[in-house]
Each structure stands twice: as C-alpha cells, then as structure tokens.
C-alpha cells in the first residue's frame, strides 16, 4: 500500500521524461500470471498497477509505454484478462514491476467470475506493500462509470494512491476531451487517494505516453 498522494513538480521536466524514456527502452520481460494470491511473485521490487474496464485499452497502453508490439496481449474479447500479469522492468537488478490487473465491467460474465475478481483485487490491493501507484484507465469517450467508481472506492479504502488516465483521447473532438478532462478532474478531487491531476493519452498517436512514463518512474522512485 502507499500513502495519500502528493504532487511532485519535477515529475514532468524534460530531464525526467528523457530518463523515463531510457528506462522503458531497456529490458522489460513478462514475469508471471497470478490467478490467485498464492501465485503472486515475491515483493522484491516496487510495483505500478493498471486497472480499467474491459477493452479500455490497458494492453495497448502497456505496449505503447514499453515500445513493444506484443508485451501485453490485446484482444477484442471483453474480460479476456482474468489474472494479474506481472512484468519486470530492468534486470540485475529489477527496477520495478508493471501489473496488468484483470479488466472489469464485463456485462456477460458469470456472477462467480465477478466475485472472484472482486476478492482477488481487494486482497491484492490491501496486502501488497510494494504497490506504489495504480493507474485507473477511463475511456475518454465515455468518462467515469459506476464500475470505475467501485474500483476507486476500493483504492480509497485500501489507501492505495491512484491517478486517473483518460485513454483513447484521439477518438473524440478536442472540445469534448476538454469537457471530459474537467469533469474527471473535478471528481478526482473528491477522492481521498486520487491524484487531483488527470492525464489524457492515446496509444495510437502517442499523445501523453512520454509524460505517463515519467509519472510511473516518479511513483516508484
């Protein structure tokens, strides 16, 4: 778990962005999948987790951040990722880990699958002392939904700091994006564990990717 967020002015300096680029250009490898807590890797390195509704673009974002085309599998099937997937960044030593959390909000999932997801995520958030930040991905075309609020409530209650990231920012008009950003920032500022700033990104165009890399590095530093 992590402390309540505080802003760092230097996080998005040109120097920080370049340093983050170099780290993400280095060795990155899939470590393991964990369908339950007993399969979690040892807590040997700080972690940043990625959460979001099914098909919000988590896998595409992970690939864009790391500059790989197939680090994380992308799928047109909502809810495909039903495990916690861990990726090592750096080697000898591992600098930190990225955690791809199971997508949520899949409408046709059986109730037992939904309950299993909730127990897995809740226990992971509350017991993972090396988890430094969670990035909650929200589709810019739709804004924050109730299922997102459920996850943010879990993060608030677990005292895990998180930042909201608007994905697919290139899919809507700039004026619509501004409105969605304003509404999202306003809601983030009502949440005890959320950063008050929101970043909009596009995995397709690269918008915001360099800045998000720097924010990830800030979280684990």
What are these regions (language model features)?
Residues 93, 119-196:
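Conserved C-terminal guanine-recognition region of P-loop GTPase G domains, centered on the G4
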Residues 87, 167, 212:
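Residue-level signal for inorganic ion chemistry
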Residues 25-37, 171-221:
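Canonical P-loop GTPase G-domain recognition
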Residues 61, 134-135, 212:
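Hydrophobic packing within well-folded, soluble alpha/beta domains
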Residues 2-108, 221:
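Conserved G1/Walker A P-loop phosphate-binding module
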Residues 40-45, 80-86, 102-132, 140-154:
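Switch II of P-loop NTPase G domains
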Residues 43, 156-163, 213-221:
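Extended low-complexity acidic/polar segments
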